[in-house]
Amino acid sequence: MHIMRTIRVLPFLVLAMTLRLCAAPMTDEDREHLRVHFEMTGHMLAEEVRGLSPAQLEYKASPDRWSIRECVSHLAVAEPDYWRDLQKAVKAPPDMKDKKSVATDADIMWYGIDRVVHTKTGGGHEKVDTYKNLGEVRAKFEALHATVIAYINTTNDDLRAHSFGDQAPIDCWQWMLEISTHTERHIQQIREIKADPNFPKK
């Protein structure tokens, strides 16, 4: 009985091993680009909020704009969802052979730099009062950042082979990069707040 069960299961094990062997891991270049960008944005965010007073953290250029503390809170609310979405997409069958990404890698990079066009945040990610304490929100952000970097350093997933998004797909490598460029975009927003002429001196 045990032998028959083993015989029935064996083909599935062989298939799973074959699929795993056929999956190509990230290139060294793709892995390095992701790692460096995530390390960069983690360092940049820490530097931008270091030593800010409560008045500086809560300052708003206008009532309808976010404060610095709210920008960081948004990152801690949104990016765990982005990470979960990525993990789900990577577990799906590879499908990029039949699709074409709607964006280039340069487009994804530019998203983190260009704030000429402002988009409205939704999907629950606008709940920027979830975290009131900067120390708490930074700890949450940094813990996820460390998890993502560990994944980048060790994964054998072929992120380029998996699509992300139904209506306007990009590949999963691009989506990982966009998580970090999303952070960069809000770092730019924090710099805009600090550059406001009415930003508290201390």
Regions found by a protein language model. Give the residues of each.
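Bacterial N-terminal signal peptides that target proteins for export
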Residues: 1-11
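Bacterial N-terminal signal peptides
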Residues: 9-20
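Short, helix-capping/interhelical loops that line the mouth of catalytic, cofactor-
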Residues: 21-33, 84-141, 167, 196-202
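Second-shell loop/turn segments in exported
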Residues: 28-35, 56-62, 67-73, 127-138, ...
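N-terminal targeting signals for Sec/Tat export/insertion, comprising classic cleavable signal peptides
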Residues: 31-59, 184
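DHp/HisKA dimerization-phosphoacceptor four-helix bundle of two-component histidine kinases
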Residues: 36, 40, 73, 77, ...
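Short, contiguous alpha-helical
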Residues: 58-108, 150, 154-202
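Amphipathic alpha-helical packing segments from all-alpha helical-bundle domains
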Residues: 137-151
